[in-house]
Amino acid sequence: DEDKYILIDYKNSSGGVKDISQMEPGLSLQMPLYIMSQQDKNIVAALYGVISSKEFKAALGKRKETSFISARNKGALYEEELKELFSITKEHIKSYIASILAGDFSIKPKECSNYCIYKDICRYKDTLEVEV
């Protein structure tokens, strides 16, 4: 039998926990990238370890591995669905690199939160036209 691995990303609080709905549109690429970086390993599930609550929350996993991720979890995917997520992740990365090279650092499709500690230096507002 092949060795099975669980990938764990530790977060201080549950605020850092992301799910598949944020991964598919490219808003959270970290967990898919972690799995992709371990192609030579049989990663059966990817979990967040929430330090403050001492809980583990499943983010992604192989649907057939129900001892590691519930089949009801939106992140429980069939092999082909995981491959598609990885393909989409690669496309998002290419798009982000192209934007960076073009000098586009916009935070689309989201807006900067009022509570963001970087909002004073972030380009979260539309460019203002100034008369010179």
Positions of the model-derived regions?
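RecB-family 4Fe-4S metal-dependent nuclease core
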Residues: 1-132
